[in-house]
Amino acid sequence: MAKFDVSTTIKRPVEDVFAVISNVENNPKWSSVALEAEQTSPGPIGVGTTARVVAKVLGRRMESDFEVTEFEPNRKFVSQSKSGPFPLQVTVTFEPIEGGTRVNTTIEGEPGGFFKLAEPLIVSVSKRQSQSDLDNLKDLMEANAL
């Protein structure tokens, strides 16, 4: 099982940060690996919401379907892949702090095949990339660009 954590503090209210992160269609605006992202189920975002994400990982284009498995507004957002190269779970927690929001992201996966062989490299590269993307989100949100 591959697992890593990244975090940042964003100088915006927790409601704003949660709204941006929980809407998968915002991912390509701040994540360098997300090429496309769209909600595939109707209605507001909540438990059971589905989405399709096209990403580029280690130079490979990958398409995955995700489902929201936990949804606590302004507190926690969990999604799990339902298709794609390997099972993946993304847990994001939100903590209101003075002057902003603390965002913690945990990514867990069970790589198989090529990805299993490259697991140490994938974890290292993915952690660095995820932290960079979270820092980009911070910059965009603090500049009111998102």
Language-model segments: what does each one mean?
Residues K3-D5, R61-D65, P87-T91:
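Short, surface-exposed coil-to-beta transition loops
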Residues V14-E15, I45, T69-N74, T93-R102:
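A short, structured loop/turn motif at beta-sheet edges
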Residues T50-K56, F77-S83:
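Short beta-strand segments that buttress and anchor functional surface loops
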Residues L58-R61, E70-K76:
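Short, charged/polar surface micro-motifs in flexible loops or helix N-caps
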Residues V78-S132, D139:
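Beta-strand/loop substructures that line and gate deep hydrophobic ligand-binding cavities in soluble
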